[in-house]
Amino acid sequence: MLRRLVQQWSVLVFLLSYSVPSRGRSVEGLGRRLKRAVSEHQLLHDKGKSIQDLRRRFFLHHLIAEIHTAEIRATSEVSPNSKPAPNTKNHPVRFGSDDEGRYLTQETNKVETYKEQPLKTPGKKKKGKPGKRREQEKKKRRTRSAWPSTAASGLLEDPLPHTSRTSLEPSLRTH
């Protein structure tokens, strides 16, 4: 019985490992046709990475669960024959003190508490001094009125260009 089973398995392994041409092509040719594309390789790589990441998360979650559920060992369960390590002092363990709030840093040791400043409501903007623009216009007029005196001497015929006319309009002035 065992001998017959071994014979069947050996024939099966031989047939599977022997390359038989299929449809006139060799098995190596079929292997080339079945090559995966780069995108398929990337997909399989990403899938493997995500599975590995999931396994790592489960492992870490299980590990953290063991840490959090581990029993807290009391320090009083020390064996009676053990000696404390040399150069160490037995101080009581204190996690907080009663006078902790008394000695704070300089910034937080203020008597007054912080008060929020009220937000400014948006209002009208302040305007400049009233009449300042008028003063500037008066100065310009003064300088303009001083120009015709130079025209009388023959230096300038037209002191100011007329901005109301465009260059396409015919000249209405007679010279």
From Swiss-Prot:
Post-translational modification: There are several secretory forms, including osteostatin, arising from endoproteolytic cleavage of the initial translation product. Each of these secretory forms is believed to have one or more of its own receptors that mediates the normal paracrine, autocrine and endocrine actions.
Domain of life: Eukaryota
Pfam families (UniProt xref): Parathyroid
An MF annotation (GO) of this entry: hormone activity
Gene deletion effect: Lethality at birth, probably from asphyxia. Mice show widespread abnormalities of endochondral bone development: bones are shorter, wider, deformed and undergo premature mineralization.
Family to which this protein belongs: Belongs to the parathyroid hormone family.
Protein name: Parathyroid hormone-related protein
Upper taxonomic lineage: Eukaryota, Metazoa, Chordata, Craniata, Vertebrata
